[in-house]
């Protein structure tokens, strides 16, 4: 059953009508005529007025005509505008029981990542041949040099991520790559609805998304990664622990509805 959409009393503004249009499309996923928008969004304006706005919004690149009937579809520009205005990225308390089913029902691939909390405990020098970096849960080794030993000793107490980023910044790439593998193998990653990634099989980002590495590359928020797909990252509280949530899907997936569904009620 479709929800009635309330867009306020100032219905003659383009933005209000465009928001109502996109919300209605997210519920129906069908081309929308002026008459259907008026009915479903409960708009208190005439169909003629709505058609006039359709023409204006089409000229502005927000809508395009689906076929000769005059029904319209939202464009990439309309979705981009709508999602930037609608989504929030504060810490969300998540109901773990709903996450799997909601990911499937809303057609989204979701990934939870609990970062590795390991810190560099000590640096062990082995006969002037190797330096072992001990993170307690794991360790790695690099070739010995006085300069490298001094550099690493200054990093004792830092997280594995911090050590990796600093190593990369000074061009110690072999060490950075080792730490990246260890960091991701020790991180706790949970995935839901892998079918949500099927449209990205040929994307250069596919494996970075699957492994959660895009959480390193993209800051918190909304990112448009393909012509018809987007990616959302945000911090969450899951099972009383702070984690990162990654959501990937098509532009027309109902991200608002998804976040409302998985939100833990106080």
Swiss-Prot record:
Transmembrane regions: none
| Family matches, as Gene3D superfamilies | Winged helix-like DNA-binding domain superfamily/Winged helix DNA-binding domain
Coiled coil regions, renumbered to chain: none
Q: SUPFAM superfamilies in the record, alphabetically?
A: Winged helix' DNA-binding domain
What does the entry give for GO biological process? Answer: negative regulation of DNA-templated transcription
Q: Which GO terms describe its molecular function?
A: DNA binding
InterPro entries hit by this protein: HrcA (IPR002571), WH-like_DNA-bd_sf (IPR036388), WH_DNA-bd_sf (IPR036390)
Keywords attached to this entry: Repressor, Stress response, Transcription, Transcription regulation
Q: What family is this protein classified in?
A: Belongs to the HrcA family.
Give a short account of what the protein does.
Answer: Negative regulator of class I heat shock genes (grpE-dnaK-dnaJ and groELS operons). Prevents heat-shock induction of these operons.
Output this protein's name.
Answer: Heat-inducible transcription repressor HrcA
Origin species, per record, is Helicobacter pylori (strain J99 / ATCC 700824) (Campylobacter pylori J99)
């Amino acid at each position: 059953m479709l929800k009635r959409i309330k867009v306020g009393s100032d219905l003659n503004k383009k933005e209000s009508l465009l928001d109502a249009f996109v919300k209605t499309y997210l519920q129906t996923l069908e081309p929308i005529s002026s008459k259907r928008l008026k009915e479903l969004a409960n708009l208190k304006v005439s169909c003629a007025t709505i058609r006039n706005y359709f023409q204006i919004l089409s000229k502005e690149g927000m809508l395009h005509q689906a076929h000769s009937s005059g029904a319209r579809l939202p464009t990439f520009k309309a979705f981009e505008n709508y999602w930037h205005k609608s989504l929030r990225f504060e810490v969300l308390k998540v109901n773990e029981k709903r996450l799997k089913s909601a990911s499937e029902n809303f057609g989204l691939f979701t990934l939870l990542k609990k970062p590795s909390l390991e810190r560099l405990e000590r640096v062990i020098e082995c006969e002037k041949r190797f330096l072992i970096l001990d993170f307690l849960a794991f360790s790695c080794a690099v070739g010995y040099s006085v300069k490298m030993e001094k550099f690493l000793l200054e990093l004792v107490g830092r997280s594995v991520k911090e050590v990796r980023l600093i190593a990369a910044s000074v061009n110690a790439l072999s060490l950075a790559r080792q730490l990246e593998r260890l960091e991701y193998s020790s991180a706790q990653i949970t995935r839901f609805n892998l079918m949500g990634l099927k449209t990205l099989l040929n994307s250069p980002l596919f494996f970075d998304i699957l492994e959660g590495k895009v959480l390193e590359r993209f800051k918190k928020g909304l990112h448009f990664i393909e012509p018809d797909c987007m990616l959302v990252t945000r911090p969450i509280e899951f099972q009383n622990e702070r984690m990162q949530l990654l959501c990937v899907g098509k532009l027309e997936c109902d991200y608002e509805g998804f976040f409302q569904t998985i939100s833990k009620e106080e």
